[in-house]
Amino acid sequence: MLATFQLDGQEFMALNGGPNHKFSEAVSLFVDCETQAEVDELWAKFTEGGEEGPCGWLKDKYGLSWQIVPSALGQLMNDTDPVRAQRVMNAMLQMKKIDITMLQQAYDQP
């Protein structure tokens, strides 16, 4: 069975490969979030019946992998100061759901 659908104006096509083809992390959907509230809301909805993973990854109740990532992560990690960027990376590696305040605290360390 083939299905097409739109999310936020972007068209997607999905093919049912049958019971022998399971979802894996080889395919994931990336959601760029502007605020912590958006991260929190999506994380709560998608992990209900699903499972949390490391570094902003999760699986929804259907087994589809998602990356729920605040825009701030890219902004902080792309800093020209490699020490600051590495501190942000190290903080993120300790997280499941990404926390913007904790990233900012790692970035701001003297």
State the predicted function of each range:
Residues 1-110:
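Glyoxalase I/VOC metalloenzyme domain signal
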